[in-house]
């Protein structure tokens, strides 16, 4: 796994995602045994597979190497013969994932997608309550042979002793309750052995209705719908579920009536029964845990919907499932009566409370001591900005919802693979996913120093100061396999004239005064009419391109471009075209042309031997081997 390049690992994830997609229908009946509705299972199964696809796509953000070359080199000497750079290599241990019961598939796939792309194998310990769902998929993953042998291992059951064997180079991540997570995090072995411990704990997440809303506004309806959805999807068993709903104090009664009214129409019970919108808790043990938390919450706030024991009228046979009907509390004094800020009932339970101002709302959110996510529902951009900047410090994510994005919004409770998932304080102070950010948790950053030739060889890309041997034949006559990093074409010179400037202005329509009006240059940096930067770049292409048909298929684009010095009529310019980096591309079909991307560093140099323009261009180049 470590020897594979990032693109190869990404293609491995893509193949795995496609394979699991072909089998996903077989996981739904298994998921239903956990009390999940079809929607709940879709979030878990399809959402989890979606994470694999997302991280497979990220392969394009990394170099075609088994390790990552980070950022830009640092010049450490006057003449440039000694430089520094950073490389990030896969850690030599394993990723140990201790997962929660609520999302037995998504919880596994959202983590292993990251460590597998990084080149680190995983040991997964699912919750014993729903491990049978995880096991069904892991069995298929192992049987597929898509992953290298041993890259994924499953440990079911209590998992006692699993942490006794972790060593330097391993990474441990935990998702679950605050109490269990804190107990694990405090074990001295993590400090003694230098093992990172990433904690993502359940938190008292909030949703805030903006002061611009009123009962007839679209945003009021969105708020009510979001609260009810977060209470009932997965029966409220989500680490991101809304536990505290905050509204302007003059809207408290209206919000209570609307939320309770919508909850009363929510059918709960056996997910196999047609029309059931909310399933059961994951186990009978969870009923007691939720009931205990509800009893504590009821000690200083008012029950306005449901029953304290979670009783209701579930569909199906009541004895067959861990059914718990939605419970809504109201707390009129959220500063004096604080149980809602301290106690989480991990089920379909939420507390409604008032606020007086936006800063007051942000303060109430922060009383949860750190949350994974808070939503603000508002149509006012100033409200959204003010609240976000005030509340962000106590949250891992701020979800802004209004009518303009509601149709496509992924919702309050859905962490996205390319965004960081985690939160401060009670939420664990950890971070998962986040696109490339997540991959970095499984890589060791190392600074390397030396001559640019040495570091260029390590980095797999040409670095400033490294040798640039003249290419023979011309680079455009070489196939992808033949092109060498650092090979350079030095062109003939071109004398820039006023005629060039006039003709380019006429052709392009760019008649900016600095190019055309020598009487308008007072107070500028220019001493005369200056050539267009894009003319210099275009003329550079005319100098370095070998126009005859050959291995180069097309110009793929420009990554960066800078015009570093004015070019005046009478200046001669030439180009150095240097191979900066090579990126292999996979064939999309049997008929596809085998090819790769070659990044060229283009340096335009004047007759004083100074750079006037630099750019990185990309070309698509045919391979010799078309198999």
Where are these regions (language model features)?
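N-terminal Rossmann-like NAD(P)+-binding subdomain of aldehyde/semialdehyde dehydrogenases
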Residues: 1-80, 265, 282
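Short, well-ordered beta-strand elements within core beta-sheets of diverse protein domains
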Residues: 1-2, 76, 96-97, 207-211, ...
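Conserved C-terminal structural/oligomerization subdomain of aldehyde/semialdehyde dehydrogenase
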Residues: 5-11, 126, 146-149, 168-169, ...
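ALDH superfamily catalytic-core signature
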Residues: 140-145, 169-171, 180-335, 358-359, ...
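Catalytic strand-loop segment that frames the active site of acyl-thioester-processing enzymes
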Residues: 472-531, 623
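HotDog/MaoC-like acyl-thioester-processing domains
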Residues: 475-488, 563, 567-627
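Hydrophobic beta-strand-centered segment that forms part of the acyl-chain substrate-binding groove
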Residues: 524-581
């Amino acid at each position: 796994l470590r020897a594979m390049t990032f693109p190869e690992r990404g293609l491995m994830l893509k193949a795995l995602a496609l394979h699991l997609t072909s089998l996903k229908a077989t996981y739904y009946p298994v998921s239903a045994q956990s009390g999940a509705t079809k929607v709940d299972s879709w979030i878990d199964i399809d959402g989890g597979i979606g994470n694999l696809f997302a991280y497979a796509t990220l392969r394009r953000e990394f170099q075609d190497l088994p390790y990552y070359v980070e950022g830009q080199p640092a010049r450490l000497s006057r003449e440039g013969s000694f430089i520094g750079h950073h490389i990030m290599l896969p850690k030599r241990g394993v990723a140990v994932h201790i997962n929660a019961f609520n999302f037995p598939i998504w919880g596994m796939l959202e983590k292993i997608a990251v460590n597998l792309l990084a080149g680190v194998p995983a040991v997964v310990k699912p919750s014993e309550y729903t491990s049978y769902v995880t096991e069904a998929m892991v069995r298929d993953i192992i049987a597929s042979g898509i992953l290298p042998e041993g890259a994924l291992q499953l440990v079911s059951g209590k998992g006692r002793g699993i942490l006794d064997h972790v060593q330097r180079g391993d990474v441990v991540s935990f998702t679950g309750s605050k109490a269990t997570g804190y107990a694990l995090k405090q074990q001295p072995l993590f400090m003694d052995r230098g093992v990172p411990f990433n904690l993502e704990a359940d938190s008292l997440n909030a949703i805030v209705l903006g002061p611009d809303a009123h009962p007839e506004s679209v945003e009021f309806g969105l708020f009510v719908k979001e609260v009810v959805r977060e209470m009932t999807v997965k029966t409220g068993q989500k680490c991101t579920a809304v536990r505290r709903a905050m509204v302007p104090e003059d809207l408290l009664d209206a919000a209570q009536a609307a939320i309770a009214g919508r909850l009363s129409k929510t059918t709960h019970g056996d997910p196999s029964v047609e029309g059931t919108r909310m399933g059961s808790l994951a186990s009978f043990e969870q009923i007691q845990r939720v009931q205990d938390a509800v009893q504590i919450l009821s000690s200083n706030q008012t029950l306005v919907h449901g029953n304290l024991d979670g009783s209701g009228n579930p569909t199906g046979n009541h004895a067959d499932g861990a059914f718990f009907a939605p419970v809504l509390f109201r707390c009129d004094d959220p500063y004096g009566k604080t149980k809602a800020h301290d106690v989480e009932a991990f089920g379909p339970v939420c507390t409604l409370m008032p606020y007086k101002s936006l800063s007051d709302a942000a303060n109430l959110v922060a009383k949860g001591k750190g949350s994974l996510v808070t939503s603000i529902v508002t149509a006012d951009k100033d409200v959204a900005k003010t609240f976000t900047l005030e509340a962000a410090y106590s949250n891992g994510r701020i979800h802004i919802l209004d009518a303009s994005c509601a149709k496509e919004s992924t919702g309050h409770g859905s962490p996205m693979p390319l965004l960081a998932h985690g939160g401060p304080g009670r939420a664990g102070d950890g971070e998962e996913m986040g696109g490339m950010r997540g991959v970095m948790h499984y890589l060791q950053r190392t600074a390397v120093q030396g001559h640019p030739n040495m570091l260029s060889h390590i980095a797999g890309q040409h670095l400033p100061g490294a040798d640039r041997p003249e290419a023979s034949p011309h680079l455009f006559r070489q196939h992808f396999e033949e092109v060498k990093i650092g090979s350079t074409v030095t062109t003939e010179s071109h004398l820039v004239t006023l005629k060039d400037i006039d003709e380019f202005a006429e052709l392009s329509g760019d008649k900016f005064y600095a190019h055309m009006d020598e009487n308008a240059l007072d107070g500028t940096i220019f001493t005369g009419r200056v050539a267009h930067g894009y003319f210099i770049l275009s003329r550079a292409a005319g100098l370095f391109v070998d126009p005859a048909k050959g291995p180069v298929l097309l110009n793929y684009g420009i990554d960066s471009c800078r015009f570093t010095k004015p070019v005046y009529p009478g200046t001669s310019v030439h180009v150095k075209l240097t191979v900066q980096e090579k990126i292999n591309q996979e064939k999309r079909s049997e008929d596809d042309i085998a090819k790769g991307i070659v990044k060229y560093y283009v340096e335009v140099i004047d007759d004083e031997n100074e750079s006037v323009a630099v750019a990185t261009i990309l070309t698509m180049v045919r391979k010799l081997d078309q198999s």
